[in-house]
Curated annotation (Swiss-Prot):
Natural source organism: Cyanothece sp. (strain PCC 7425 / ATCC 29141)
Reactions catalysed, as given in the entry: (6R)-10-formyltetrahydrofolate + 5-amino-1-(5-phospho-beta-D-ribosyl)imidazole-4-carboxamide = 5-formamido-1-(5-phospho-D-ribosyl)imidazole-4-carboxamide + (6S)-5,6,7,8-tetrahydrofolate; IMP + H2O = 5-formamido-1-(5-phospho-D-ribosyl)imidazole-4-carboxamide
GO BP field: 'de novo' IMP biosynthetic process
Domain MGS-like: 1-146
CDD domains: IMPCH
Keyword terms, alphabetized: Hydrolase, Multifunctional enzyme, Purine biosynthesis, Transferase
PANTHER family: BIFUNCTIONAL PURINE BIOSYNTHESIS PROTEIN ATIC, BIFUNCTIONAL PURINE BIOSYNTHESIS PROTEIN PURH
Molecular function GO terms recorded: IMP cyclohydrolase activity; phosphoribosylaminoimidazolecarboxamide formyltransferase activity
Family as reported in the entry's similarity comment: Belongs to the PurH family.
Name by which UniProt lists this protein: Bifunctional purine biosynthesis protein PurH
Top-level taxon of the source organism: Bacteria
């Protein structure tokens, strides 16, 4: 009896060539349905349509095609079990040896902006997952393929095994099939949850399925294994970035790049540059040109900028690229790169240069592992709304101070708590990050700023529990402070600001970052 293959694919890539090899090299008989059958017949291949094979026509507008005992019995039958073989013989069912199925493109469909719920439901595949699961369950006897990428390896296996496949190969294929259906079902459940007006923003059940996108040399340290995973079939975000040159990205590179991206995404108008080290900004600046923004960000803390990660909000030009070659940098990311800039940066062959067209696209959820589970939160995408800020001091800010406070607040949002940022003329002068007490971060930021703190502004990601930070800022020459407010001792801080002639603004929004 010649081997029997069932082919029913949504993605027709390579299926005709694969089927031709099955027939010509290994003598397979083909069963197929719908568009796949049409494609194979058009290519001149001998095909039995599923409806002819089962004796049952497609019904319900194609919703029921392959859900038939003649199909599933042929797949699930155990060839080493006499009773199963007797059942096949009694019902005239032939065993099916190879199943090639990929599913309706549900995730691509729901990504379309005009997609309705009813349209999405029609893209939920029923027969396909049933075929994959049945074949994968019976991997002891059946080979199952769920992706065009598997056609080549399968043909190589058939050639090596004289028209057969090994148990190890079939088990590997079954594993891929079950992952495929699990990911598919998760996408459907997630979509239906997001479409449910009664559902809360974070569902009571959460399943995360991801595919390894790239193996990484190691994690934060050489003794830690690491890999880069992509959720779903998403092509946006970092997996959609283009690396123009440089060494492979490391785990730490990606973590720092994401931090730099999040900061620079706050600046959408004037040219802006961000330089980060260990996820904290060591220099952030705006400028009339991109090269000016970069030079100002670099000069903000040139010592820390050495070996830093740079993010730009405008396409990288030649003049800026030339300035960047003057020091050692690990990575650069920008929404574009002009040919002149690309040519200049090639002199730094190890420098990683990436193009990420949409810098604003961040993660949909933030996940942090803890013992026995993980924590999930929505990203801090609270828009900065100066119109809702409150001036609580007697001294009112000038327009120039107001704009500077906005700039400082944008940066402070992305600094590890306790976070203090000192800025003037749209450039960071001092950054106090990650200290266990707020006044400690204040002292670090003011020390970095030095004499430049005179007339500068200070932003704090959280409220001041005491007035000591306000007094330290005033002693250094700070002219205006922006903070969330909300402390039981807010009155003490306001009183200190008034006594010392400082502007104080409450945002009524906290931006802790741990």
């Amino acid at each position: 009896m010649p081997p029997l293959a069932l082919l029913s694919t949504s993605d027709k890539t390579g299926v005709v060539e694969f089927a031709r090899s099955l027939v010509n090299e290994f003598g397979f008989q083909l069963i197929s349905s719908g568009g796949t059958a049409k494609a194979l017949i058009a290519a001149g291949l001998p095909v039995t349509k599923v409806a002819d094979y089962t004796g049952s026509p497609e019904i319900l507008g194609g919703r029921v095609k392959t859900l038939h005992p003649r199909i599933h019995g042929g797949i699930l039958a155990r060839r080493d079990l006499p009773t199963d073989l007797q059942d096949l013989a009694a019902t005239g069912i032939e065993p099916i040896d190879l199943v090639v199925v990929n599913l309706y493109p549900f995730e691509q469909t729901i990504a379309q902006p005009d997609m309705t719920l009813s349209d999405a439901i029609e893209q939920i595949d029923i027969g396909g997952p049933a075929l994959l699961r049945a074949s994968a369950k019976n991997f002891a006897h059946v080979t199952v393929l769920c992706s065009p990428e598997q056609y080549g390896p399968c043909l190589a296996e058939l050639r090596q095994q004289q028209g057969q496949t090994s148990l190890i190969f079939r088990q590997s294929c079954a594993q891929k099939a079950f992952w495929h259906t699990a990911t598919y079902d998760q996408a459907i459940a997630t979509y239906l949850t997001s479409s449910d007006p009664t559902e809360i923003s974070l569902p009571p059940r959460l399943s995360v399925t991801a595919t390894q996108f790239q193996s990484l040399r190691y994690g934060e340290n050489p003794h830690q294994a690491a890999a880069w995973y992509r959720t779903g079939t998403a092509t946006g975000g970092w997996s959609g970035a283009t690396q123009l040159q440089g060494k492979e990205l490391s785990y730490n590179n990606l973590v720092d790049l994401e931090a730099a991206r999040a900061i620079v995404a706050e600046f959408t108008e004037q040219p802006a540059a961000v330089i980060t080290k260990h996820t904290n900004p060591c220099g952030v600046a705006e400028g009339d040109s991109l090269v000016e923004a970069y030079r100002r960000a670099f000069q903000a803390d040139s010592t820390s900028a050495f070996g830093g990660i740079v993010a730009l909000n405008h396409p990288l030009d030649g003049e800026t690229a030339k300035a960047m070659t003057e020091t050692f940098l690990e990575c650069i990311v920008a929404p574009g790169c002009e040919p002149e800039a690309e040519a200049i940066l090639k002199t730094k062959s190890n420098l990683r240069v990436l193009v990420l067209p949409d810098l604003s696209q961040g993660a949909s959820l933030e996940i942090k592992a803890i013992a026995g589970g993980f924590l999930v939160q929505q990203p801090d995408r609270q828009p900065i709304q100066p119109q809702s800020w409150e001036v609580v001091s007697q001294t009112k800010p000038t327009e120039e101070q107001w704009q500077e406070l906005i700039f400082a607040w944008k940066v402070a949002k992305h600094v590890k708590s306790n976070a203090i940022v000192v800025t003037a003329d749209r450039v960071t002068l001092g950054v106090g990050a990650g200290q266990m007490n707020r006044v400690g971060s204040v002292q670090i930021a003011l020390t970095q700023a030095g004499e430049k703190a005179q007339g500068a502004v200070l932003a704090s990601d959280g409220f001041f529990p005491f007035d000591d930070s306000v007094r330290a800022a005033a002693a250094a020459g700070i002219g205006a402070i922006v903070q969330p407010g909300g402390s039981k001792r807010d009155a003490d801080s306001i009183q200190a600001a008034d006594q010392l002639g400082l502007v104080m603004v409450f945002t009524h929004t906290r931006h802790f970052l741990h």
